[in-house]
């Protein structure tokens, strides 16, 4: 019977680079001929991925499955937590909404069910794959939470997985973070840590080497590698990553793409393809004073559309967006929650998001939205009609609500139905389809249309985003193989399987 060899990546904090390293190892193992699966027992994220059977998992595990060349399933992320408001989140179990819970309720009442779900998924994956790349969350040294944690050392024990601890040197204090984390671990868990990887390094490695030697002597734990800072086009999962994005226009780029950053922004990976375009400056906007006059304004998805509409009002963005449409030639695009905001009204008769019955939208699209208790999660494809051209597009939908188009024209023709809406002048468009901009032909047409409006020649050579993503997986794997002792990690994986737990 097949029995997967597991390896687990844990970090000193969120956004240390666990997801990226897990993705790299999924690619490395797959390239070496091993059938490989990613696993994250519990993921807290507003960036989702829809599986082939219409289930919802964390974006990172979907991307890691792509890197491994396997079909993503809910066993790769059996529990997904989607924050919807302060101290409350939607709990998604095996890709379907389970219940909205307060943080305290989840901790006190979900623990035993969570353990059972995790054990079941581990059993399935361990018996179907050769390698299992497990990702932790946050830090394993959260001493106030460890008695009922479901995602770090408890999972390592359940899978009998060796652990690699990841530290982010870019933030500073990496040795303090690594040493402090190791010291706060229980002795049995500390023995699982086979080494550390220092991530996001910039500069002269020789200046770091005395610190590496000191760390190994002080802790007895091996430094398995120092990974340089990498600019890779692979989806960010954690909203912490948003802090790295620009808030000001790059004047060297011809097209100014502004993205509204509201508190409950979700699936912001929708805009990733614009970062690959040579003439696009992408910036995030969170107040009226920084809106300016962009060429393209994107209202992305939201986990709580009504609360984020109030955010637009409180920050002055609501009226500024309306004035922007009236006074400029901007193209506005709403995706999912952003599409709902562009409409006339968002009704919430079942109080899915807030105690309010309804809220007024921006009234830039002739639609009305009614939120519902049942969530739609589906892969979709169809024909998009825009500026007298037709484009085959595919993506996915994740939403709780339906939008009725009162007038105007649909944007996308699906099999037996339509999706989205556009104004007659096609300056405002909206859709429930995530990954819309991942469709190269439409994205290229949109951007070259903006160039023509600005009396600039269109660019005939633009990137194929899916090819770039595939290349990014290989570039990432190449970089990690160069800078990390992969063979030492594989040896420890085999030793743990045999029950040999001695030091490196």
Curated annotation (Swiss-Prot):
Single GO molecular function: ABC-type vitamin B12 transporter activity
Keyword Membrane recorded: no
Domain GATase cobBQ-type: 254-442
Pathway the protein acts in: Cofactor biosynthesis; adenosylcobalamin biosynthesis
Transmembrane segments: none
Pfam families per UniProt: CbiA, GATase_3
Top-rank taxon, per record: Bacteria
Keyword Lipoprotein applies: no
PANTHER family: COBYRIC ACID SYNTHASE (PTHR21343:SF1), DETHIOBIOTIN SYNTHETASE (PTHR21343)
Its job: Catalyzes amidations at positions B, D, E, and G on adenosylcobyrinic A,C-diamide. NH(2) groups are provided by glutamine, and one molecule of ATP is hydrogenolyzed for each amidation.
NCBIfam families: cobQ, PRK00784.1
Name this polypeptide is given: Cobyric acid synthase
Organism: Anoxybacillus flavithermus (strain DSM 21510 / WK1)
Lineage of origin: Bacteria, Bacillati, Bacillota, Bacilli, Bacillales
């Amino acid at each position: 019977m097949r029995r997967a060899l597991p390896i687990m990546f844990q970090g000193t904090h969120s956004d240390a680079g666990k997801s990226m390293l897990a993705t790299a190892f999924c690619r490395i193992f797959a390239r070496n001929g091993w059938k490989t699966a990613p696993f994250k027992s519990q993921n807290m994220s507003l960036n989702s991925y829809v599986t082939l059977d219409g289930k919802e998992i964390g974006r990172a595990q979907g991307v890691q499955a792509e890197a491994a060349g396997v079909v993503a399933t809910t066993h790769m992320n059996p529990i997904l937590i989607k924050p919807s408001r302060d101290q409350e989140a939607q709990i998604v179990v095996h890709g379907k909404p389970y219940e909205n819970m307060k943080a305290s309720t989840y901790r006190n009442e979900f623990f035993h069910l969570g353990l059972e779900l995790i054990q079941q998924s581990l059993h399935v994956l361990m018996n179907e794959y050769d390698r299992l790349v497990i990702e932790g969350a946050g830090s394993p040294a959260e001493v106030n939470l460890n008695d009922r944690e479901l995602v770090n050392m408890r999972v390592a024990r359940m899978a009998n997985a060796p652990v690699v601890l990841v530290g982010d040197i870019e933030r500073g204090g990496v040795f303090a973070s690594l040493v402090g984390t190791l010291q706060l671990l229980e002795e049995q868990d500390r023995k699982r840590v086979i080494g550390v990887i220092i991530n996001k390094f910039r500069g002269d490695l020789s200046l770091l080497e005395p610190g590496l030697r000191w760390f190994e002597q002080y802790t007895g734990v091996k430094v398995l590698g120092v990974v340089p800072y990498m600019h890779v086009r692979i989806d960010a999962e954690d909203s912490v990553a948003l802090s790295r994005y620009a808030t000001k226009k790059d004047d060297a780029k011809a097209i100014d793409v502004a993205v509204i950053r509201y508190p409950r922004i979700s699936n912001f990976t929708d805009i990733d393809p614009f970062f690959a375009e040579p003439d696009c400056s992408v910036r995030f906007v969170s107040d009226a004073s920084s809106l300016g006059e962009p060429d393209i304004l994107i209202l992305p998805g939201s986990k709580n559309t009504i609360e984020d509409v109030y955010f637009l009002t409180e920050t002055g963005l609501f009226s500024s967006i309306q004035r922007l449409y009236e006074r400029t030639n901007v193209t506005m695009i709403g995706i999912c929650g952003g599409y709902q905001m562009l409409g006339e009204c968002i009704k919430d008769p079942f109080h899915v998001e807030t105690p309010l019955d309804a809220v007024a939208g921006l009234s830039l699209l002739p639609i009305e939205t009614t939120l519902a208790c049942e969530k739609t999660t589906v892969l979709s494809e169809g024909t998009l009609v825009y500026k007298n051209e037709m484009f085959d597009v595919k993506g996915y939908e994740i939403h709780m609500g339906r939008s009725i188009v009162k007038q105007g024209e649909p944007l996308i023709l699906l099999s037996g139905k339509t999706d989205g809406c556009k104004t007659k002048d096609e300056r405002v468009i909206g859709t429930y389809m995530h990954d819309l901009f991942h469709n190269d032909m439409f994205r290229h047409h949109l951007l070259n249309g903006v160039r023509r409006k600005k009396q600039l020649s269109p660019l005939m050579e633009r990137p194929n985003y899916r090819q770039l993503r595939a290349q990014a997986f290989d570039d990432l794997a190449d970089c990690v193989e160069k800078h990390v002792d992969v063979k030492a990690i594989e040896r420890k994986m085999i030793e743990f399987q045999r029950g040999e737990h001695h030091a490196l």
